[in-house]
Amino acid sequence: MPTEHPNVVLSRQHFDLMADQYDELFVTHMHAYDLTHEMVLTMLPFPRESALRVLELGTGTGNLTQKLLDRFPKSTLVGYDVSAEMLARARAKLARAGTRVQLHQGDISQIAFPGPFDAAISAIAVHHVPPPAKPILFHRLYAALRPGGVLILGDAFQPATPALGERYRQLTAEEFERQGIIETPAYAEYRSRNSQPSGGASTHLQKYLQWMQQAGFSNVDCVWKQFARAVVYGERPLEA
């Protein structure tokens, strides 16, 4: 059995610890959370009546999963997450979906995905993959897709410079203020007491695009970006 990378151990411990509060604290306080989900789903180039088979990386508590199942009512989904506690919340949330959803605990940098899939999706998860494993992951995702399948990833990316990152934080705070979103006491307490790193290691956006192209994806693009959040898209070409 492969030795777990320290980032993976940290991620699992972090999300196991915060699973009970994830939906309460982070859906509101994470910048562009719902908008990232919406852009991932909007870019799926399929009619809504399609019987899609979808792979999800980093299912978490099942929020993107539920939106996918609602938007594509004939779809099925296979999802993975490193945290057993997060998946327990997802299973409860998605109980009505029955056999349409299969959820598994595991390190997505090590799993052999049971393709073929029509689409692979993710939101705010792949940055937790250990840096050396990220390029390899894109090759494995390419192999898991059927010809004509699509990869759509929303994630947190590393700003080009520290100064730009600080500007992003300022603009996000201003946006929250305009929207009337205030830091709740529960979230302030979480931030003050949670000194354990989450295992995340964000990467420059251009690296994702480069790795996707190197893996064989075509029509690779950044289809949406707001500050340090972005959605990238690529297609596995139809074979002749």
For the regions a language model picked out, list residue spans one by one:
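Conserved class I S-adenosyl-L-methionine
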Residues: P2-R48, N63, K67
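Class I SAM-dependent methyltransferase SAM/SAH-binding core
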Residues: R53-L57, T61-Q110
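A short His-aromatic
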Residues: R71, H127-V129
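A short acidic, Gly/Pro-enriched loop at the edge of an enzyme's catalytic core
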Residues: A112-A120
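Residues lining the SAM
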Residues: S122-H127, G154
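A short glycine-rich, Lys/Arg-flanked "PGG" loop and its adjoining helix->strand segment in the class I
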Residues: P135-P147
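C-terminal alpha-helical "lid/dimerization" subdomain adjacent to the S-adenosyl-L-methionine
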Residues: G154-Q213
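Core SAM-dependent methyltransferase catalytic element
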Residues: A215-A240
